[in-house]
A protein has these predicted regions:
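Transmembrane beta-strands of outer-membrane beta-barrel pores
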Residues: 66-70, 83-85, 99-101, 115-117, ...
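Bacterial Sec-dependent N-terminal signal peptides
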Residues: 1-27
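Residues on the lipid-exposed face of transmembrane beta-strands in outer-membrane beta-barrel proteins
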Residues: 64, 222-224, 238, 259-265, ...
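Residues that define the transmembrane beta-barrel architecture of outer-membrane proteins
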Residues: 58-60, 216-218, 253-259, 268, ...
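Membrane-embedded beta-strand positions of outer-membrane beta-barrel proteins
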Residues: 64, 113, 129, 145, ...
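Predominantly the C-terminal beta-signal and adjacent terminal strand-loop region
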Residues: 229-232, 268, 334-398
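Repeated loop/turn-to-beta-strand initiation elements of outer-membrane beta-barrel proteins
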Residues: 105-107, 121-123, 137-139, 154, ...
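Outer-membrane beta-barrel proteins
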Residues: 233, 283-285, 317-320, 354-358
Length: 398
């Protein structure tokens, strides 16, 4: 991971520093010379100003540059319409129309129309229209239109339109339109439009539009897909995989289909269900169903758990031709009869919504005869609904 961070950092450094060759050459020229300090620098471009050829060995309290400025460092304020280049440290305010480049530490506020690039740490605020780049630690805030990058840790806030990257630990908040990456532990919140990723641990919350990935999570994950080795809270999403969590394969029956297969994954506090069912009949067509659900399973005793589940399944006769949705709320008991084997059973209340314009729906009850106690036809969209009490029972392996 450290090698990858160094490679990425090197690539970004070259890409983000159009005058890097210039600054490195000048730094070599001045590295053995003693720096001096002045209260004020006024320049048009590097070396064409009040400090002249001594620009690279002079730190300025104030520096005002018509197009661009170059100095050993800034102590209070630096401004330029295009760019500022500091060989060493910069504080407390640095403003540029295009980019700021600092070879040392930054303390205070650094704002640029396109990019900020620092070769050491920053303590304060960085704001750039496109990218903030630093090879040192960040303590404070980074705001960028596209990306924030640091090869070290972040303690504070990263907000980017596309990507945030912290090579080491994150303590605070990462918010990005597409992705957040932290190479070390995360203590706080990651929120992204697509993906949050850390190969280490999270103490807090990950929220993503598609994927959250972490090792050990002491908190929660909220996303379409979630992955963690272990998690103390609830992974909420379409599909959550917790390596040391709750995984079961179920063979069961209900009042509609005698054979159902279901897979549960997540944690007992919150899990997802994927299932299919079939009615084994010798006919010209097959009655089958597929569906999805969510549930929770609190412990009742040493070997007994409660199941509270909500699910929906599409019941079909051959191909999927029309809406025929069975929505089920189930409350049952799960009893551990052996290691990794459990029996379950319980009642359910069912709400069917179906398309009345289609007349080839399969019969609901072939092997049992529940009584439908409520039927209703809707005036719009050729829809109707039914209510009835049912059951579920079977065996689970995990």
């Amino acid at each position: 991971m450290k090698t990858v961070n160094k490679i990425i950092g090197a690539i970004l450094f070259v890409a983000l520093n159009p005058l890097s060759a210039f600054s490195q050459t000048v730094s070599t020229d001045f590295e053995n010379q003693e720096t001096r300090n002045t209260e004020l620098q006024i320049s048009i471009v590097p070396y064409l100003g009040t400090n002249g050829k001594n620009s690279g060995i002079t730190t300025n309290d104030f520096s005002f540059n018509l197009f661009g400025g170059y100095s050993a460092g800034t102590n209070k304020l630096e401004m330029a319409s295009l760019f500022n280049i500091n060989r060493l440290d910069a504080k407390y305010v640095q403003l540029a129309g295009i980019f700021n480049q600092v070879g040392g530490k930054v303390e205070g506020a650094q704002f640029a129309g396109i990019a900020n690039a620092n070769l050491d740490s920053i303590r304060g605020v960085q704001g750039a229209g496109i990218v903030n780049f630093t090879t040192g630690a960040v303590e404070g805030t980074q705001l960028a239109g596209i990306t924030n990058f640091t090869s070290k840790s972040v303690r504070g806030f990263q907000g980017a339109g596309i990507v945030n990257f912290a090579g080491q630990e994150l303590t605070g908040f990462q918010g990005a339109g597409i992705a957040n990456f932290a190479g070390g532990n995360v203590k706080g919140t990651q929120a992204a439009g697509i993906v949050n990723f850390t190969p280490k641990d999270v103490q807090g919350v990950q929220v993503a539009g598609i994927l959250n990935f972490a090792r050990k999570v002491n908190g929660s994950q909220i996303g379409l897909f979630n992955y963690a080795d272990s998690i103390s809270g609830a992974p909420i999403g379409l599909l959550s995989i917790v390596k040391s969590g709750y995984h079961t394969l179920e063979i069961g029956t209900d009042e509609i289909l005698p054979i159902n297969l279901s897979f549960r994954t997540g944690t007992r506090s919150f899990y997802n269900m994927l299932f299919v069912g079939i009615r084994p009949e010798i006919t010209d067509y097959t009655v089958w169903a597929f569906g999805y659900g969510i549930g929770t399973s609190p412990r009742l005793g040493r070997k007994t758990f409660l199941n509270i589940e909500a699910s929906s399944q599409q019941l079909n006769r051959g191909n999927v031709e029309a809406l025929n949705l069975i929505n089920r709320f189930y409350v049952g008991a799960d009893f551990q009869v052996a290691r990794k084997v459990a029996l379950f059973a319980g009642p359910s209340i069912n709400f069917r919504v179906y398309d009345t314009s289609y007349n080839q729906h399969p019969d609901l009850f072939t092997y049992s005869g529940p009584k439908v106690f409520s039927e209703r036809n809707y005036r719009f969209d050729d829809l109707a609904s039914q209510f009835w009490w049912g059951f579920r029972a079977g065996i689970r392996f995990f």
